[in-house]
Amino acid sequence: MSSAQRVVITPGEPAGIGPDLVVQLAQRAWPIELVVCADGPLLTERAAMLGLPLSLLPYSPDVPAAPQPAGTLTLLPVSLRAPAIPGQLTVENGPYVVETLARACDGCLQHEFAALITGPVHKGVINDAGIPFTGHTEFFEERSQAKKVVMMLATEALRVALATTHLPLRAIADAITPALLHDVIAILHHDLRTKFGLRNPHILVCGLNPHAGEGGHMGTEEIDTIIPVLDELRAQGMHLTGPLPADTLFQPKYLDHADAVLAMYHDQGLPVLKYQGFGRGVNITLGLPFIRTSVDHGTALELAGQGKADVGSFITALNLAIKMIVNTQ
C-alpha cells in the first residue's frame, strides 16, 4: 500500500468472544489503522479479564490514517445499553450491536474506511429485541442499497460462493431463477477480478439436484435454468464449468484448476469448506460498494472472557481485507 489505510472493525455480540478477539488483534502491530466501533469500557474490561495490555486511542477522521502500534486500538465509541457479562445474552444490547454495524457501514459508504471486518453476532437476541435481522449480509445489502450481494466463504485453498443463502430447503428450487443466477455469477466474476486480482477467473458451478439432474431424470432445473444461463455467460467470455454434481466437484482434479465454486445453496458447499478449514475461513460479502470480510464462526458464549478463543479466523479476515484493499488500488 502506498500509504496507511484505515479499516473499521465491529466486535459483534458483547457477551460473546468478539471483544476477546479484538483485544487479541491488538497484541501485534498492523500496517493499517484499526478503528473499532464498540463500547470502550467493554474492551478495557475484557482486556483485563484476559490479562492483556490495551490502550484505546481516540478516532479522528480528520487526522491521516497511521499504522496501528501493538497494544493499541483506535476507538469509535458506541455505548452499551446494559452491562455485558461474558456468556450471558442481554436483549437490551441488541440495538447496540445493530448501531455498531450501521455506523461502520455508513463510514465505509462515506469513504472513511477502506474495509469493514465483522465479528460474530447473535441473530436471536437481536430479533428478540424487536429488530428484524437475518444476518450481516442482508443487513449491509439493504443499508448500502446494493442491487444484489453474494455470500462467499474462503480458506487458503478454496473459495465457495452461494447462489442462495438462508433459505429453507423447500424454497431453494423456486429461488434458482435465470435472473438470480445471472446476477450472482456476474457479481462473483466481477469481484474475483477487481477485489482478488484474478484476470480471468475460472468458476465451477454445482448442479442443484443429485448427479446434476442426471439428464433430467432427477430434476430439470439444470436443463431448464442453469445450463442456459451458463451458456449465455460463456458466450460473453466468462470461464465457467458446470453444472457439475456437488458430490464429485470437490476433488483436486477440478479444484486444482479453479478459482471459486458456486454452490446452489448453503449446505451444499459450506460443509466441505468448513471441514477443510474451520477456524481459518473468512466470510466475504461480494457486490457491496465496499470491502467486507468476517470470521466464519459464531459467538461461542461459553468461551467469552476466558482467554480460550482462537483469534485465527479474525486475523485471516483482516489480512484478506488488507490484500483486497491492495488489489483495488
Swiss-Prot record:
InterPro entries in the record: PdxA (IPR037510), PdxA_fam (IPR005255)
Keywords from UniProt, A to Z, are: Cobalt, Cytoplasm, Magnesium, Metal-binding, NAD, NADP, Oxidoreductase, Pyridoxine biosynthesis, Zinc
Stated name of the protein: 4-hydroxythreonine-4-phosphate dehydrogenase
Annotated residues that bind a divalent metal cation are located at 166, 211, 266
Among the GO molecular function terms of this UniProt record, one is:
NAD binding
Q: Which family does it belong to?
A: Belongs to the PdxA family.
Enzyme Commission number(s) from the entry: 1.1.1.262
Output the PANTHER family linked to this UniProt entry. 4-HYDROXYTHREONINE-4-PHOSPHATE DEHYDROGENASE
Co-factor binding comment: Binds 1 divalent metal cation per subunit. Can use ions such as Zn(2+), Mg(2+) or Co(2+).
Quaternary structure (record):
Homodimer.
Under the heading HAMAP family, the entry gives: PdxA
Q: Name the needed cofactors.
A: Zn(2+); Mg(2+); Co(2+)
Q: What else is on record for this protein?
A: The active site is located at the dimer interface.
For the keyword NADP, the answer is yes
**Residue positions binding substrate:** 136-137, 274, 283, 292
Localization terms from the record: Cytoplasm
What are the recorded Gene Ontology BP terms?
pyridoxal phosphate biosynthetic process; pyridoxine biosynthetic process
Per the record, its GO cellular-component terms are: cytoplasm
Q: What does this protein do?
A: Catalyzes the NAD(P)-dependent oxidation of 4-(phosphooxy)-L-threonine (HTP) into 2-amino-3-oxo-4-(phosphooxy)butyric acid which spontaneously decarboxylates to form 3-amino-2-oxopropyl phosphate (AHAP).
Reaction(s) catalysed by this chain's protein: 4-(phosphooxy)-L-threonine + NAD(+) = 3-amino-2-oxopropyl phosphate + CO2 + NADH
Name the source organism.
Answer: Salmonella arizonae (strain ATCC BAA-731 / CDC346-86 / RSK2980)
Query: What is this organism's lineage?
Result: Bacteria, Pseudomonadati, Pseudomonadota, Gammaproteobacteria, Enterobacterales
